[in-house]
Each structure stands twice: as C-alpha cells, then as structure tokens.
Amino acid sequence: MKLPILLVYLTALIVGLSYGMHNPIVPVFSKEIIGASYFELGIIGLTNFLPYMFIPLFVGILLDKFNNGLLLSAGITLNTASIYLLSISQSVPEIAFFRALTGMAHAFFWPPCERIISQVEDPENRVKSIARFMGFFVGGLMIGPLIGTFLLENLDVTYRILFQYSTYAIAIAIITSLLLSKYGKTTQHSTIAFGSIKQMTKFPVIVIMLIFCSTAFGTFLTIYPAFMNDRSISESNIELLFFIFGISRLATLAFVGPLQRRTFHSLIATILSIAAGMLVVFYSFTFEMFTIAMLIMGFGFTIYFPLTFEIIMRKSQKKFSGGLIGAYEATFGIGWAAGPLFAGIVAEAFGKDTPYLGFFVIGIIVTLILVLNRKKLQIQWNQNL
C-alpha cells in the first residue's frame, strides 16, 4: 500500500473515532442538559451543516492551488478547537455556533482526502481506495461509540468530559495530516471558477439522489438520537446502536466491488433501504426495532457515496477535478443543512415521528425518478481523464 494512502486511511480512522465518541450524544446533551426543543435541535443541525453548503466550493478551488495536506491539517485543527468549545457551551446559540465551526472544519477534511486519493491512485483502483478510505472512517465511527459507552457507564464521565476526550483523540490526526503535506502538493494550477461548479449541473439525477440521502443522513445525525432518547433508549444504548450501524456500514463496504458492477441496481437498493429504515424507525419503540432500522440504513447511508463519486469523476474532465469535488461535497451540505431544519419543524408541528414517515414517502418518489433515468446512472469511461 502506498504511504500517502495509508496516512489518509489512518487520519480518517482517528477523525472517525473522535466523531463516533461524541456525535451521537450531542443531540441528547442539547436536549437534556441545555434544554433544546426539537425545533432548536433542527436549528443546531442546520448551523452545523450550513457551512458545508458553501465552503467545499472554496476548498475545491484551493485544492488546485495549495498543498492538500496542509489544507487537511487546517481543517483538523479547527475541528479540534470546535469540539473542545462544545464541552464548555452553556446555551443553544453557543452550541449552534460551535457546531457551525465543526461544519467548517469538516469541509476541509473530506475534499483534501478525496483529492489525494484521486491523485495517487489510477482510475481502475479509485473506487476501491475511496471505499477503503470510507471504511477506515466508518471503522472509527463504529469504535468511537463503544469507547463513549464505556466512559459513560464505567467511568461515570459527564457529557462535557466525553467531549474533551474526543478533543484529545482528534488532535492526534493533526500529526498524520501534517505528514501528508509531503504528498499533498498539487500537480496543477488551473483557474477554477464556475466551470467546475457547473459540471454538477450535468448530473441532475445524481444531485436529486445526493440531496435525498444527505437530507435523511443530516436528520439521522442531529435529530434521530434525541428521538430515540424520547422513546426510552438510554444514552449508552444509543451509542451501542451507532456501533451496530457502523458494523452494517463496514459490511456494506466489503461488497463495493460487486455492487459497482451493478451500479443502477445498487443505487436503487440504496434509496429503498433508507426509505425502509425510516419506516421501521417510525414504528420503533424498543432497542430491537431500532437495531433493525440501523442495520437497514447502514447499507443505504454507505454505498451511495463511492458509487456516485465515481460516476461524476469518470464523466468529467480532469481539469475540473478539484472544483468538482468541492461542488460534489457542497451538494451534501445542502441536504445535511436542510434535513435537520425540515425534521425539526415537522416534528414540532405534526409529531416527533412524522419526519421519518415523510422520508419513507420521499424515498419512494426518488426511487421512481431513478428508474426513469436508468441510463444516467451507469459508470462509463471519459476519454479526457
């Protein structure tokens, strides 16, 4: 394995570990300790992901002009600071602001890693390398909740102390990201303006799919843990459920190769699994039912990323790669920001479980759109790459 790829994987593992330790608890902390309503949880989720709607576009431009490893280091440093500040927050506005910093930091994490992998690996191996990168990140997300559960149950740490431990964990990734600066030098200095951003408009079906998946995932990360807590799932069991979710995601990534060969069917299965998982959530009141939902959604929230990424990369010119990655990630930001706001408003107006039924219905509609546009979802070679 090439050293820069290994360093990217290690960085992803560490960052995922930190995220897994504290992210599932943030909505519970906000609701139980700070006293946030579901609408306020939606606002916190919105501010968390709102920067990801715009900053990846800026980062995409920087990827073609500056050292990708240093950009990654800057993002992880900001992330470290934002998690620590979360541990001393006292109000909903403070949490919202600190989560916005986290969103900004994440915009400097994912795109540089994708770009380094894209530069080092040839197109034939890129899907597997991106999937492995995601696998290490998911592995961290899977192990993190177990560590969080152990700390909460056996060492009797508070939520705030758990956030501080997460800060120490992610700080280690600053070292590995700095080592990547040796390999993160850009090989091109083209002028990236709206040309690369406009490339995303060539993929309307992919954009619709990404927005649905990311909207559901944004709700999953920011509202769903509080919903489980309201249905009598304890904090430690919430962490355990996210561990189970991680197992499902890792198992899915092991089959990226076969799934890639059936792109259309895999993407249809992705949407249907998210929709079905949300329907199970709607009817869930026990740990066992939530476990079933986590296992189903683990597939859907995993496989769409490497497949859609490869579709747009193979159908676009290499000169647009940096800006295109930024535009691709910004599309996630739109969904991540809209999801919590949508779920928060709907939960306050129609009931806490209504958003999940809504996602099921929307998922069926998106599936029909994909079926009607099958040819646009096939991975094909672009000779200009």
Locations of regions flagged by a protein language model:
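Juxtamembrane intracellular "pre-TM" segments in multi-pass secondary transporters
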Residues: 1-2, 181-208
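Helix-loop boundary and gating motifs at the non-cytosolic
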Residues: 2-49, 203-210, 214-231, 235-238
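Transmembrane alpha-helices of Major Facilitator/SLC transporters
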Residues: 50-54, 239-259
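Conserved MFS/SLC helix-loop-helix module at the cytosolic interface between two early adjacent transmembrane helices
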Residues: 54-90
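Helix-to-loop junctions at the C-terminal end of transmembrane segments
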Residues: 55-67, 252-264, 347
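Structural signature of the two symmetry-related core transmembrane helices
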Residues: 70-84, 265-280
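Cytoplasmic helix-loop-helix junction between adjacent transmembrane helices
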Residues: 98-137
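Symmetry-related core transmembrane helices of the 12-TM Major Facilitator Superfamily/SLC fold
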Residues: 161-178, 356-372
